[in-house]
């Protein structure tokens, strides 16, 4: 696998002795796996590269939506009442804005929520995060979801419509806390 992707993005060299590769299946695809690659020699040190793999084809998750939509069309995606929240979390994490992921913040102990912060900030985050919810379907068959989003240094409550094809639309977002002294740091490219 490493020989297929080395160097990642033309700049991150892999090494059989130091590069860690992990994979897992995703419940909204039958044959697609998510591959996670990390190496302590890379800068920034918290960089993690991700790929989707479908029957040998690799799709680099680089912050853009195109690789996900390509896999959704090819695999194809199968969104259900039971897996829509996991798909929403996946999509929002891997499709980036200028300031990083749209982290669906369900728990203050999430690995991507900063741990170093003052007590007031911790209180705001702990008092805001909550499990994302599936609220049912609309007349178009879109899955309606509600979630707390941690983007950059702000928290929002957002409402989403997830289409069966995997397209996601943020219907509404209300800021809860802005200009926090911490932000989500989870580089993928």
Protein language model regions, located:
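Extended, low-hydrophobicity segments enriched in charged/polar residues
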Residues: 1-127
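Acidic, serine/threonine-rich low-complexity disordered tracts
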Residues: 132-135, 140-144, 148-189
């Amino acid at each position: 696998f490493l020989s297929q992707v080395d160097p990642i993005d033309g700049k991150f060299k892999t090494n059989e002795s130091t590069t860690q590769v992990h994979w897992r299946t995703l419940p909204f695809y039958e044959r697609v796996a998510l591959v996670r690659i990390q190496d302590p020699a890379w800068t920034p040190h918290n960089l993690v590269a991700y790929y989707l793999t479908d029957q040998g084809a690799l799709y680099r998750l680089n912050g853009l939506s195109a690789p996900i939509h390509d896999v959704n069309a090819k695999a194809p995606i199968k969104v259900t009442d039971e897996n829509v929240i996991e798909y929403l979390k996946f999509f929002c994490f891997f499709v980036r804005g200028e300031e990083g992921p749209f982290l669906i913040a369900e728990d203050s102990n999430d690995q991507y929520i900063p741990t170093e912060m003052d007590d007031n900030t911790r209180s705001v985050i702990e008092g805001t995060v909550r499990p994302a919810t599936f609220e049912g379907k609309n007349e178009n068959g879109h899955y309606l979801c509600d979630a707390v989003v941690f983007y950059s240094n702000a928290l929002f409550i957002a409402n989403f419509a997830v289409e069966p094809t995997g397209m996601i639309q943020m219907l509404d977002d209300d800021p809860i806390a802005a200009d926090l002294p911490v932000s989500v740091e989870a580089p993928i490219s």
